[in-house]
Amino acid sequence: MKMQMKNSRLVVTGMGAVTPIGIGVDAYWNNLVQGVCGVDAITRFDTENLPVKIAAEVKDFDPLAFMPKKLTREMDVFMQYGYAAAMEAIDMAGGDDIASPERMGITVGTALGGIAPIGETQDGISTGLHKKVSPRFVPKIIGNEAAAQVAIQKGYRGPSLTVSTACSSGGDAISTACMMLLSGQADAVLAMGTESALSPLFILGLSSAH
């Protein structure tokens, strides 16, 4: 399949943001231009026995503002961030009238997927706190679930791809979306980058490589 690159124009019609310096595009941009710093003391878990006490943590995020309670139980935090940002972008771009479901694609970039549930579950098993693993465990750690949940909830049936290329995952998801459009595979593509790697396991892993 040949890409018709010459004279092709791709247009960004919507954006969404869930970040350490703001939830929502307006809040994020206003804080960005004002020089607000998102790095602060970690509050998600106890850091007493960890070598690192600070991180760029997303705070004041309420998933119920973006999805029903039942859906929050199906998603790890990285999926919730992506889903919330996706809903904002979709709404900004025109809602359900963006493209037909069959021609609506999704690309997601995530380096680690659900790394936090892996550490939490292993700790629970090792300490005897958990006698069995939740049936939601595997779906919560799979990187592609971020794209899948959006597609399921919105009824999109176009191409759905997940890119995992370390720190460039989000950028590569955008370039993959561009190629998807230029090749004619889709009329519109939701390009996402999402991560929630903040966990004791990840902190210890990075610290040991310092």
Question: Where do the model's predicted regions map?
Answer:
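Short, high-confidence coil segments that cap the C-terminus of an alpha-helix
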Residues: A186-D187
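Short loop-beta-helix segment that forms the pyridoxal 5′-phosphate
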Residues: P159-T165
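Catalytic metal-binding/acid-base residues of hydrolase active sites
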Residues: E195
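Internal active-site segments that recognize and position negatively charged phosphoryl groups
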Residues: T176
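Active-site histidine-anchored catalytic micro-motif
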Residues: A173
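Conserved "HGTGT" condensation-loop signature of ketosynthase/thiolase-family condensing enzymes
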Residues: M1-G158, M179-L182, L198, L204, ...
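Short conserved active-site loop signatures built around small residues
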Residues: G170
